[in-house]
Regions:
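A short glycine-rich, His/Asp/Glu-containing loop-to-beta-strand
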Residues: 1-27
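Conserved hydrophobic/aromatic beta-strand scaffold that supports enzyme active sites
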Residues: 7-11, 29, 45, 53-55
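A short, compositionally biased micro-patch
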Residues: 13, 25, 32, 49, ...
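Short acidic-glycine-tyrosine-enriched beta hairpin
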Residues: 41-61
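Double-stranded beta-helix
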Residues: 63-99
């Protein structure tokens, strides 16, 4: 199967945090469009501001947090052979979705 593409917009509420996760079949490219995003990429913590971007490689452990008082918005471009929500391995999750 060839490479597929999917674009979606992520919203992270103030003081919110998404699950710590990785993907077996896709890489992601994030462009911050609003707020300051605190991004975990493997063992690194990176702050990205509006207009800044980051590449999340295949198999990289990652998450985004919003340490601020305003929502964070990120445009996410997914590239890979499988672009489904089933391609998520979660390590930490405040909603109890770690298997």
């Amino acid at each position: 199967m060839g490479k597929e593409f999917l674009i979606k917009e992520l919203f992270v509420k103030p003081k919110g945090i998404l699950s710590l996760q990785k993907h077996h079949h896709r890489a992601e490219h994030w462009l911050v469009t609003q707020g300051n995003a605190k991004i975990t990429l493997n063992k690194d913590i990176i702050i990205k501001k509006p207009g800044e971007h980051i590449f999340i490689p295949l198999e990289a452990i990652h998450r985004v947090q919003n340490p601020g008082k305003k929502p964070v918005k990120i445009m996410e471009a997914q590239v890979g052979s499988i672009l489904k929500e089933t391609d998520i391995v979660r390590y930490q999750d405040i909603y109890g979705r770690v298997k």
